[in-house]
Amino acid sequence: MFENLCALQLDSDLFAQAIHPEEPIVAVGLASGHVQTYRLPPGASDDSDPDEALAAEKGFGHIATTWKTRRHKGSCRTLAFSVDGSSLYSAGTDGIVKVADTTTGRVTAKFAVPLDLANGGIDAPTLVHALSPQSLILGTDSSALHIYDIRDQGAKSAFKPQATHRPHDDYVSSLTPLPPTEASTSGFSKQWVTTGGSTLAVTDLRRGVMVRSEDQEEELLSSVMVTGLSKKGTSVGEKVLVGGGNGVLTLWERGVWDDQDERITIDRSKGGGESLDVIALLPDGVGPGGKIAAVGLGDGSLRFVKLGPNKIIDELKHDELRQEGVIGLGFDVTGRMVSGGGKKLNIWGEKTWQDVPEDDEDEQEEEAPANGKREHESDEDEDSDEDMEESSEDDEPKQKRKKRRKGKGGKQAKGHGILHFSGLA
């Protein structure tokens, strides 16, 4: 279904990944505190030069580092683009949230994460999410969920929480907005689902925590919303998929939040399944059709589940050599899949060779490099953060956050590599 187009080597372990909503741009946050953005080659769905798009489709494109800087003291834990993609939010173990211009990387605003009420220390962030042009949500280790009104970032009160909720007893591990109802006048979500510990909760922008599920007796780590499913019986055709720490994907019917509706086993490794750390839904027009979820596992596997039959239809490996968990997973505006984990970022495209005549396929194989793909090393000469409103260059490196590591599990899929990007050293 997908083949590896390019592998980019990172300078430090990946802790966060974000994909631009309107342009082929990927941002990464690293254990070293660095934040870096890459611009991918244009795709068929871009409005760019058709010749460039054709070159990228044939495997001849260039991935450019737009900017790179040490943004945080310690590690960068989470990243998120604004709704229109003009700003990039980052938050680190230094207890600071910074807002940067996506194009230049220059910091335009910053504010401190509220301290942990239990000990008065830094309450490290776990996620940041731009719900709308008006609202920003920040989750922390202490289970706090802070809501900010960011319409006027110049106001002194702009970066003080308008409200704080605690939907879980443990840290907030994932957040998924619920689609706005037909009665919505803004077109933006005002409710969202979060996971934390062994519970799922629904929170409303104005009314706070509305419902919390029963204890699922398993760790809930990731989530994604799926719409357009079959409406049978009382089903509204909308479900939230939740990835668990034991290799099971659970489905939750919208509006029925007390308990899960269905279960799909993704991994059956001995000693308990691998954790399902991240989930992304294939965009319309990508893949063989139907609703398909891509799931990133703690052992570095990528598995694809077709909803309805609820069956695994394909499997890939983020890294053939190392068993690093998949930390980031998503699709850019052109439909390419981006997976991140360890010190590696992979760009995947849909397989194209199935529809190529045998003669043409032979010619392509002769022209392809022997190893099928090339590694892209990070640029060591990128600008530092000296020209920005930063003071983190003088800090000593902090200890990296411990990452979840489990035993080997699952069958490794053979790597693809018929396409590649040229010019990547």
UniProtKB/Swiss-Prot annotation:
The record's subcellular locations are: Nucleus, Nucleolus
Quote the biased-composition stretches of kind Basic residues, using this chain's numbering: 399-414
Q: Which SUPFAM superfamilies match?
A: WD40 repeat-like (SSF50978)
Q: Which PROSITE patterns match?
A: WD_REPEATS_2, WD_REPEATS_REGION
Q: Which parts of the chain are coiled coil?
A: none
Q: Which GO terms describe its cellular component?
A: nucleolus
Region annotation Disordered: where it falls in the sequence: 354-425
User: InterPro entries annotated for this entry?
Assistant: WD40/YVTN_repeat-like_dom_sf, WD40_repeat_dom_sf, WD40_rpt, WDR55_POC1
Bias regions of kind Acidic residues — which residues? 356-368, 378-396
Start-end of the WD repeats?
9-48, 71-110, 117-158, 219-262, 321-358
Q: Name the keywords, alphabetized.
A: Nucleus, Repeat, WD repeat
Q: What is its main location?
A: nucleus
Note whether Repeat occurs among the keywords: yes
Question: Matching PANTHER family, A to Z?
Answer: WD REPEAT-CONTAINING PROTEIN 55
The family this protein is said to belong to: Belongs to the WD repeat WDR55 family.
What's this protein's name?
WD repeat-containing protein JIP5
Gene name per UniProt: JIP5
